[in-house]
Amino acid sequence: MSFMLEVDPQKTGEAVDRYLKHDFERYLRLSGKHRTDISSPSMNGMPSGSPGNAQEAKIIEGTYAGQVVNAIVATIQNCSDFDYRKPYKQILVDYYIRGLQNFKIAQKIGYSDRQFDFKKRMAQCEFADRFEYWKIVYHVQDQPCLQIMQRAKNCAKFAD
């Protein structure tokens, strides 16, 4: 008997939410960046200041944090935003970067609260999927996998 797994949207959304609210904020601080710095896709992730022997560990930590920030920004920039049915990039930017409240984003993109909650969850799931690729590109594979899996509801159909 085989078990088919699929992403659990609720738990994945919660994992992405925790990561982008807490870990992302910490990496921004460690890299010397601010949310206002990441509106430009040309961000290079390099820490500011001059390196010194006494501060080598801090420089390395800041450089790594910059790479994590770049991976997060690239992931958000790569999320779907090509039509009104998938405004995922806009939702992620407005909520996690600009700090807008859910109801304001819902009004901005023309969705009811219920529709918005679903779209936000789908945006979080897309972020979790795409983050796996961008972690490799930016050499931060030790960052957590945000995809939380569950047994597929209809897996009996596919069992051996």
Locate each region found by the language model.
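Amphipathic alpha-helical interface surfaces
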Residues: V68-I72, P87-Y88, K119
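Short, locally clustered residues in the helix-turn-helix/winged-helix DNA-binding domain
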Residues: Q77, V93-I97, A128
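N-terminal interaction/assembly modules
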Residues: M1-S80, Y133-D160
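Short amphipathic alpha helix immediately N-terminal
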Residues: F82-L100
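Short acidic, glycine/proline-enriched loop segments that cap or flank alpha-helices
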Residues: C79-D83, Y111
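C-terminal low-complexity, acidic/polar tails when present
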Residues: S42-S50, Y111-R114, M122-A123
